[in-house]
């Protein structure tokens, strides 16, 4: 079930891994799916950590497994910037900022 889930859901990094010219490479994840992935990460941390959850939990989870994830370097950088912003400013302020940038048609890779 897990292989099916991550292979069909574009917010999983595994979806953005492809063989190009005979070599496996990470592909830059569209910002829409970066945001979905951040939400998925937050939800998973809240479910598994329950009362132990803090605004740092999604970042800590990401950092603990980032070497095992084959994210495109630009995607990895954006993930970490957003997760650090959550740690410092909280979810509400982070998603408010993301919504503002998206409504202004800004590229999160450039503007966040």
Label the model's feature ranges:
Residues 1-112:
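Metal-dependent phosphohydrolase cores
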């Amino acid at each position: 079930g897990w292989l099916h889930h991550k292979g069909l859901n574009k917010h999983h990094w595994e979806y953005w891994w492809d063989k190009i010219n005979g070599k496996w490479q990470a592909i830059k994840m569209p910002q829409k799916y970066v945001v979905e992935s951040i939400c998925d990460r937050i939800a998973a941390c809240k479910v598994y950590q329950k009362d132990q959850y803090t605004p740092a939990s999604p970042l800590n989870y990401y950092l603990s497994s980032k070497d095992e994830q084959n994210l495109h370097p630009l995607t990895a950088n954006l993930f970490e910037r957003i997760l650090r912003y959550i740690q410092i400013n909280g979810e509400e302020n982070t998603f408010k900022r993301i919504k503002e940038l998206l409504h202004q048609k800004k590229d999160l890779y450039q503007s966040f």
